[in-house]
Design a protein with these regions (language model features):
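Conserved acidic donor-binding segment of nucleotide-sugar-dependent glycosyltransferases
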Residues: 308-321, 329-335
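Conserved donor-binding/catalytic core segment of Leloir-type glycosyltransferases
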Residues: 4, 183-214, 223
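Short alpha-helical donor nucleotide-sugar binding micro-motif in glycosyltransferases
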Residues: 137, 252-253, 260-265
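Nucleotide-activated donor-binding/catalytic signature segment of Leloir-type glycosyltransferases, i.e.
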Residues: 233-253
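Acidic donor-binding loop of glycosyltransferase active sites
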Residues: 263-278, 291
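Donor nucleotide-sugar binding/catalytic pocket of nucleotide-sugar-dependent glycosyltransferases
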Residues: 38, 133-179, 249
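Short His-centered aromatic/hydrophobic patch
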Residues: 91-98
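Short hydrophobic beta-strand element within catalytic cores of glycosyltransferases
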Residues: 288, 292-297
Length: 369
Protein backbone atom coordinates (compact mmCIF):
# COMPACT_ATOMS: atom_id res chain seq x y z
CA UNK A 1 0.00 0.00 0.00
CA UNK A 2 1.45 3.33 -1.10
CA UNK A 3 -0.16 6.60 0.00
CA UNK A 4 0.13 10.22 -1.14
CA UNK A 5 -0.87 13.09 1.14
CA UNK A 6 -1.97 15.94 -1.15
CA UNK A 7 -2.75 19.50 -0.10
CA UNK A 8 -1.80 22.86 1.39
CA UNK A 9 1.77 24.05 1.71
CA UNK A 10 5.08 23.75 3.48
CA UNK A 11 6.61 24.75 5.85
CA UNK A 12 3.81 24.09 8.33
CA UNK A 13 1.64 27.15 8.96
CA UNK A 14 -1.51 25.69 10.48
CA UNK A 15 -3.49 22.66 11.53
CA UNK A 16 -4.18 21.17 8.09
CA UNK A 17 -0.52 21.13 7.13
CA UNK A 18 0.44 19.67 10.51
CA UNK A 19 -2.06 16.83 10.11
CA UNK A 20 -0.70 16.05 6.63
CA UNK A 21 2.87 16.01 7.86
CA UNK A 22 2.05 13.96 10.96
CA UNK A 23 0.19 11.38 8.87
CA UNK A 24 3.16 11.07 6.51
CA UNK A 25 5.71 10.63 9.29
CA UNK A 26 3.45 8.45 11.43
CA UNK A 27 2.39 6.11 8.64
CA UNK A 28 5.94 5.72 7.33
CA UNK A 29 7.14 4.91 10.86
CA UNK A 30 4.55 2.08 10.92
CA UNK A 31 5.95 0.65 7.69
CA UNK A 32 3.41 2.21 5.30
CA UNK A 33 4.92 4.03 2.32
CA UNK A 34 3.57 7.58 2.44
CA UNK A 35 4.74 10.65 0.52
CA UNK A 36 3.47 14.24 0.61
CA UNK A 37 2.93 16.60 -2.33
CA UNK A 38 2.31 20.27 -1.60
CA UNK A 39 3.09 23.80 -2.73
CA UNK A 40 6.06 25.61 -1.20
CA UNK A 41 5.25 28.97 0.35
CA UNK A 42 8.95 29.87 0.65
CA UNK A 43 11.45 29.63 -2.22
CA UNK A 44 14.08 27.87 -0.13
CA UNK A 45 11.66 25.02 0.56
CA UNK A 46 11.22 24.08 -3.12
CA UNK A 47 12.48 20.59 -3.86
CA UNK A 48 12.21 16.96 -2.78
CA UNK A 49 13.44 15.51 0.51
CA UNK A 50 13.64 11.83 1.41
CA UNK A 51 12.68 11.92 5.10
CA UNK A 52 13.11 8.18 5.58
CA UNK A 53 13.02 5.08 3.37
CA UNK A 54 9.21 5.22 3.19
CA UNK A 55 8.48 8.97 3.17
CA UNK A 56 9.31 11.67 0.63
CA UNK A 57 8.31 15.33 0.89
CA UNK A 58 7.73 17.03 -2.48
CA UNK A 59 7.41 20.84 -2.28
CA UNK A 60 6.59 22.42 -5.62
CA UNK A 61 7.24 25.98 -6.70
CA UNK A 62 4.34 28.44 -6.42
CA UNK A 63 4.11 31.92 -7.93
CA UNK A 64 1.37 33.61 -5.91
CA UNK A 65 -0.96 33.26 -2.96
CA UNK A 66 -4.66 34.00 -3.39
CA UNK A 67 -6.51 34.09 -0.07
CA UNK A 68 -5.26 30.90 1.62
CA UNK A 69 -4.38 29.08 -1.62
CA UNK A 70 -0.93 28.84 -3.18
CA UNK A 71 -1.05 28.91 -6.99
CA UNK A 72 1.27 26.16 -8.19
CA UNK A 73 1.06 24.83 -11.75
CA UNK A 74 4.17 22.80 -10.89
CA UNK A 75 2.11 20.90 -8.32
CA UNK A 76 -0.47 20.04 -10.98
CA UNK A 77 2.11 18.72 -13.44
CA UNK A 78 3.95 16.79 -10.73
CA UNK A 79 0.70 15.12 -9.68
CA UNK A 80 0.06 14.11 -13.28
CA UNK A 81 3.55 12.60 -13.59
CA UNK A 82 3.28 10.52 -10.42
CA UNK A 83 -0.41 9.57 -10.63
CA UNK A 84 0.32 5.88 -11.22
CA UNK A 85 2.68 5.56 -8.25
CA UNK A 86 0.05 5.50 -5.50
CA UNK A 87 -2.75 3.19 -4.38
CA UNK A 88 -4.51 5.94 -2.41
CA UNK A 89 -4.41 9.72 -2.68
CA UNK A 90 -5.39 11.38 0.60
CA UNK A 91 -6.40 14.92 -0.36
CA UNK A 92 -6.86 17.57 2.31
CA UNK A 93 -9.69 20.11 1.99
CA UNK A 94 -10.05 23.09 1.86
CA UNK A 95 -7.38 23.62 -0.77
CA UNK A 96 -8.57 24.36 -4.33
CA UNK A 97 -5.03 23.86 -5.65
CA UNK A 98 -4.87 20.28 -4.39
CA UNK A 99 -8.30 19.54 -5.81
CA UNK A 100 -7.33 21.01 -9.18
CA UNK A 101 -4.10 18.98 -9.20
CA UNK A 102 -6.04 15.77 -8.54
CA UNK A 103 -8.59 16.54 -11.25
CA UNK A 104 -5.88 17.49 -13.78
CA UNK A 105 -3.83 14.37 -13.06
CA UNK A 106 -6.43 11.88 -14.28
CA UNK A 107 -5.64 9.68 -11.26
CA UNK A 108 -7.68 6.44 -11.34
CA UNK A 109 -7.03 4.97 -7.89
CA UNK A 110 -8.75 5.32 -4.53
CA UNK A 111 -9.32 8.80 -3.07
CA UNK A 112 -9.65 9.66 0.62
CA UNK A 113 -11.01 13.19 1.08
CA UNK A 114 -10.08 14.75 4.43
CA UNK A 115 -12.72 17.41 5.08
CA UNK A 116 -11.04 19.68 7.64
CA UNK A 117 -13.60 22.46 7.23
CA UNK A 118 -16.00 24.16 4.84
CA UNK A 119 -14.87 27.23 2.95
CA UNK A 120 -16.55 29.96 4.98
CA UNK A 121 -14.85 33.33 4.50
CA UNK A 122 -13.87 33.25 0.81
CA UNK A 123 -17.38 33.30 -0.64
CA UNK A 124 -16.37 34.73 -4.02
CA UNK A 125 -13.71 32.04 -4.38
CA UNK A 126 -16.27 29.41 -3.39
CA UNK A 127 -18.56 30.41 -6.25
CA UNK A 128 -15.76 29.67 -8.71
CA UNK A 129 -14.61 26.56 -6.88
CA UNK A 130 -18.03 25.01 -6.20
CA UNK A 131 -18.19 22.79 -9.35
CA UNK A 132 -14.71 21.41 -8.67
CA UNK A 133 -15.55 20.90 -4.99
CA UNK A 134 -18.67 18.95 -5.94
CA UNK A 135 -16.56 16.83 -8.32
CA UNK A 136 -14.13 16.09 -5.46
CA UNK A 137 -16.92 15.06 -3.08
CA UNK A 138 -18.37 12.71 -5.69
CA UNK A 139 -14.94 11.37 -6.67
CA UNK A 140 -13.96 10.49 -3.10
CA UNK A 141 -14.27 6.87 -1.99
CA UNK A 142 -14.33 7.96 1.66
CA UNK A 143 -14.75 11.36 3.31
CA UNK A 144 -12.87 11.82 6.57
CA UNK A 145 -13.97 14.38 9.16
CA UNK A 146 -12.21 15.49 12.32
CA UNK A 147 -15.38 15.29 14.42
CA UNK A 148 -18.84 13.71 14.03
CA UNK A 149 -20.36 17.14 14.66
CA UNK A 150 -18.70 18.74 11.65
CA UNK A 151 -19.44 15.81 9.36
CA UNK A 152 -23.15 16.08 10.14
CA UNK A 153 -23.30 19.89 10.11
CA UNK A 154 -21.55 20.59 6.81
CA UNK A 155 -24.17 21.39 4.14
CA UNK A 156 -21.82 20.01 1.48
CA UNK A 157 -21.78 16.53 3.02
CA UNK A 158 -25.47 16.00 3.75
CA UNK A 159 -26.02 13.80 0.70
CA UNK A 160 -22.91 11.66 1.19
CA UNK A 161 -23.18 10.68 4.86
CA UNK A 162 -22.95 7.00 3.89
CA UNK A 163 -19.29 7.40 2.95
CA UNK A 164 -18.15 9.57 5.87
CA UNK A 165 -15.98 8.45 8.77
CA UNK A 166 -14.61 10.32 11.78
CA UNK A 167 -10.85 10.51 12.35
CA UNK A 168 -10.09 12.80 15.31
CA UNK A 169 -6.85 14.73 15.04
CA UNK A 170 -4.11 13.40 17.29
CA UNK A 171 -0.90 14.99 18.55
CA UNK A 172 2.11 13.90 20.54
CA UNK A 173 1.92 14.99 24.20
CA UNK A 174 3.50 18.33 24.97
CA UNK A 175 7.09 18.16 26.14
CA UNK A 176 6.74 20.97 28.66
CA UNK A 177 9.68 23.31 29.25
CA UNK A 178 9.71 22.73 33.01
CA UNK A 179 12.25 25.44 33.82
CA UNK A 180 10.45 27.94 31.62
CA UNK A 181 7.12 27.07 33.24
CA UNK A 182 8.59 27.51 36.72
CA UNK A 183 9.97 30.92 35.75
CA UNK A 184 6.55 32.00 34.50
CA UNK A 185 4.87 30.76 37.69
CA UNK A 186 7.32 32.89 39.63
CA UNK A 187 6.67 35.90 37.38
CA UNK A 188 2.92 35.60 37.96
CA UNK A 189 3.18 34.37 41.53
CA UNK A 190 -0.16 34.22 43.33
CA UNK A 191 -2.12 34.54 40.07
CA UNK A 192 -4.57 32.15 38.45
CA UNK A 193 -3.17 31.94 34.91
CA UNK A 194 -5.52 31.62 31.94
CA UNK A 195 -3.68 30.95 28.67
CA UNK A 196 -4.89 31.24 25.09
CA UNK A 197 -2.97 30.78 21.85
CA UNK A 198 -3.67 31.65 18.22
CA UNK A 199 -3.62 34.31 15.54
CA UNK A 200 -5.11 37.65 16.52
CA UNK A 201 -7.99 37.52 14.04
CA UNK A 202 -11.74 38.18 14.45
CA UNK A 203 -12.97 34.58 14.49
CA UNK A 204 -10.80 33.78 17.54
CA UNK A 205 -13.06 35.96 19.70
CA UNK A 206 -10.23 37.53 21.70
CA UNK A 207 -12.13 40.75 22.33
CA UNK A 208 -14.60 38.70 24.39
CA UNK A 209 -11.82 36.93 26.26
CA UNK A 210 -10.25 40.29 27.08
CA UNK A 211 -13.61 41.68 28.17
CA UNK A 212 -14.10 38.69 30.49
CA UNK A 213 -11.32 40.13 32.68
CA UNK A 214 -13.75 42.87 33.77
CA UNK A 215 -15.68 40.15 35.59
CA UNK A 216 -12.60 38.75 37.37
CA UNK A 217 -10.74 39.99 40.43
CA UNK A 218 -7.04 40.80 40.54
CA UNK A 219 -6.06 37.21 41.35
CA UNK A 220 -6.53 36.36 37.66
CA UNK A 221 -4.29 37.05 34.67
CA UNK A 222 -5.12 36.26 31.03
CA UNK A 223 -2.14 35.59 28.75
CA UNK A 224 -2.72 35.51 24.98
CA UNK A 225 0.05 34.19 22.71
CA UNK A 226 0.25 34.90 18.99
CA UNK A 227 0.38 37.79 16.55
CA UNK A 228 -1.95 39.05 13.87
CA UNK A 229 -3.83 41.99 12.38
CA UNK A 230 -5.91 42.70 15.50
CA UNK A 231 -2.92 43.38 17.75
CA UNK A 232 -3.36 47.16 17.80
CA UNK A 233 -7.14 47.25 18.38
CA UNK A 234 -6.84 44.59 21.09
CA UNK A 235 -4.09 46.55 22.84
CA UNK A 236 -6.32 49.62 22.65
CA UNK A 237 -9.20 47.64 24.14
CA UNK A 238 -7.00 46.51 27.03
CA UNK A 239 -5.80 50.06 27.70
CA UNK A 240 -9.21 51.72 27.33
CA UNK A 241 -10.73 49.18 29.73
CA UNK A 242 -7.94 49.58 32.28
CA UNK A 243 -7.05 45.89 32.09
CA UNK A 244 -3.28 46.21 31.66
CA UNK A 245 -2.63 44.26 34.88
CA UNK A 246 -5.08 41.49 34.02
CA UNK A 247 -4.50 40.85 30.30
CA UNK A 248 -1.20 40.50 28.43
CA UNK A 249 -0.64 40.05 24.69
CA UNK A 250 2.52 37.97 24.44
CA UNK A 251 3.13 38.21 20.69
CA UNK A 252 4.73 35.39 18.71
CA UNK A 253 5.94 32.50 20.87
CA UNK A 254 8.59 29.93 19.97
CA UNK A 255 7.75 26.24 20.33
CA UNK A 256 9.66 26.10 23.61
CA UNK A 257 7.90 29.19 24.93
CA UNK A 258 4.52 27.71 24.00
CA UNK A 259 5.20 24.59 26.06
CA UNK A 260 6.36 26.74 28.97
CA UNK A 261 3.11 28.72 28.97
CA UNK A 262 1.06 25.53 28.68
CA UNK A 263 2.99 24.16 31.65
CA UNK A 264 2.60 27.33 33.71
CA UNK A 265 -1.08 28.01 33.10
CA UNK A 266 -3.90 26.76 35.27
CA UNK A 267 -6.45 26.66 32.47
CA UNK A 268 -6.62 27.01 28.69
CA UNK A 269 -9.29 29.07 26.95
CA UNK A 270 -10.53 28.84 23.36
CA UNK A 271 -12.85 31.80 22.82
CA UNK A 272 -13.52 31.32 19.09
CA UNK A 273 -16.83 32.60 17.73
CA UNK A 274 -17.19 31.16 14.21
CA UNK A 275 -17.10 27.68 12.66
CA UNK A 276 -13.93 28.69 10.80
CA UNK A 277 -12.42 26.82 13.75
CA UNK A 278 -13.58 23.26 13.12
CA UNK A 279 -11.61 21.36 15.77
CA UNK A 280 -9.11 23.36 17.83
CA UNK A 281 -5.85 21.41 18.04
CA UNK A 282 -4.62 23.69 20.83
CA UNK A 283 -7.32 22.22 23.06
CA UNK A 284 -5.90 18.72 22.88
CA UNK A 285 -2.38 20.07 23.41
CA UNK A 286 -3.65 21.66 26.62
CA UNK A 287 -5.36 18.40 27.63
CA UNK A 288 -2.12 16.50 27.07
CA UNK A 289 -0.59 18.73 29.74
CA UNK A 290 -3.51 18.05 32.09
CA UNK A 291 -5.04 21.50 31.73
CA UNK A 292 -8.82 22.01 31.90
CA UNK A 293 -10.32 23.86 28.93
CA UNK A 294 -12.97 26.54 28.61
CA UNK A 295 -14.26 26.65 25.03
CA UNK A 296 -17.26 27.89 23.08
CA UNK A 297 -20.32 26.11 21.70
CA UNK A 298 -19.98 27.21 18.08
CA UNK A 299 -22.88 25.93 15.96
CA UNK A 300 -21.65 23.40 13.41
CA UNK A 301 -18.12 23.24 14.83
CA UNK A 302 -16.40 20.33 16.54
CA UNK A 303 -14.74 22.56 19.16
CA UNK A 304 -17.27 21.78 21.90
CA UNK A 305 -17.12 18.07 21.01
CA UNK A 306 -13.36 18.03 21.53
CA UNK A 307 -13.78 19.70 24.92
CA UNK A 308 -16.36 17.47 26.62
CA UNK A 309 -18.62 19.70 28.73
CA UNK A 310 -18.20 19.14 32.48
CA UNK A 311 -15.62 16.45 31.76
CA UNK A 312 -12.45 18.03 30.35
CA UNK A 313 -13.73 21.55 30.96
CA UNK A 314 -16.70 23.83 30.38
CA UNK A 315 -18.28 25.05 27.13
CA UNK A 316 -20.12 28.38 26.98
CA UNK A 317 -22.01 30.34 24.36
CA UNK A 318 -19.83 32.33 21.91
CA UNK A 319 -19.41 36.09 22.39
CA UNK A 320 -20.40 35.91 26.07
CA UNK A 321 -17.68 37.49 28.20
CA UNK A 322 -19.55 37.04 31.47
CA UNK A 323 -20.06 33.33 30.76
CA UNK A 324 -16.34 32.89 30.10
CA UNK A 325 -15.50 34.55 33.41
CA UNK A 326 -18.03 32.43 35.29
CA UNK A 327 -16.57 29.25 33.77
CA UNK A 328 -13.07 30.31 34.84
CA UNK A 329 -14.30 30.85 38.40
CA UNK A 330 -16.16 27.54 38.57
CA UNK A 331 -13.04 25.62 37.59
CA UNK A 332 -10.34 27.61 39.37
CA UNK A 333 -12.01 28.52 42.66
CA UNK A 334 -12.71 24.97 43.84
CA UNK A 335 -9.69 22.69 44.22
CA UNK A 336 -11.69 19.46 43.96
CA UNK A 337 -13.42 20.65 40.78
CA UNK A 338 -10.12 21.75 39.28
CA UNK A 339 -8.39 18.45 40.05
CA UNK A 340 -11.27 16.45 38.57
CA UNK A 341 -11.29 18.45 35.33
CA UNK A 342 -7.51 18.27 35.10
CA UNK A 343 -7.46 14.48 35.46
CA UNK A 344 -10.38 14.02 33.05
CA UNK A 345 -8.77 16.32 30.47
CA UNK A 346 -5.64 14.17 30.55
CA UNK A 347 -7.69 10.97 30.29
CA UNK A 348 -9.64 12.33 27.33
CA UNK A 349 -6.42 13.17 25.52
CA UNK A 350 -4.88 9.72 26.07
CA UNK A 351 -8.12 7.96 25.16
CA UNK A 352 -8.98 9.87 21.99
CA UNK A 353 -6.42 12.36 20.74
CA UNK A 354 -2.93 10.86 20.59
CA UNK A 355 -1.01 10.84 17.34
CA UNK A 356 -0.67 7.05 17.60
CA UNK A 357 -4.45 6.59 17.72
CA UNK A 358 -4.89 8.89 14.71
CA UNK A 359 -2.38 6.86 12.70
CA UNK A 360 -3.92 3.51 13.70
CA UNK A 361 -7.42 4.65 12.75
CA UNK A 362 -6.14 6.08 9.46
CA UNK A 363 -4.60 2.73 8.51
CA UNK A 364 -7.97 1.06 9.22
CA UNK A 365 -9.70 3.53 6.91
CA UNK A 366 -7.21 2.83 4.13
CA UNK A 367 -7.59 -0.93 4.52
CA UNK A 368 -11.37 -0.64 4.14
CA UNK A 369 -11.11 1.11 0.78
Amino acid sequence: MKILQLGKFYPIRGGVEKVMYDLMTGLSAMGVSCDMLCAACEKEEVGERQLNERAKLMCMRSFAKVKATMLSPAMMFKMRRIRKDYDIVHVHHPDPMACLALWFSGYKGKVALHWHSDIIKQRKLLKLYKPLQRWLINRADVIIGTSPVYLKASPWLRDVQDKTVCLPIGVVPLDVDVEGAAALREEYKGKKIIFSLGRLVPYKGYKYLIDSARHLDNSYVILIGGGGPLKTPLLEQIENSGLQDKVKLLGFLSDSEVTAYFGACDLFCMSSVYATVAFGIVQIEAMSAGKPVVATKIPGSGVSWVNAHKESGINVEPKDSAALALAFKRILECEDTYNAYSEQASQRYWTMFTKAKMIEKCVEIYKNL
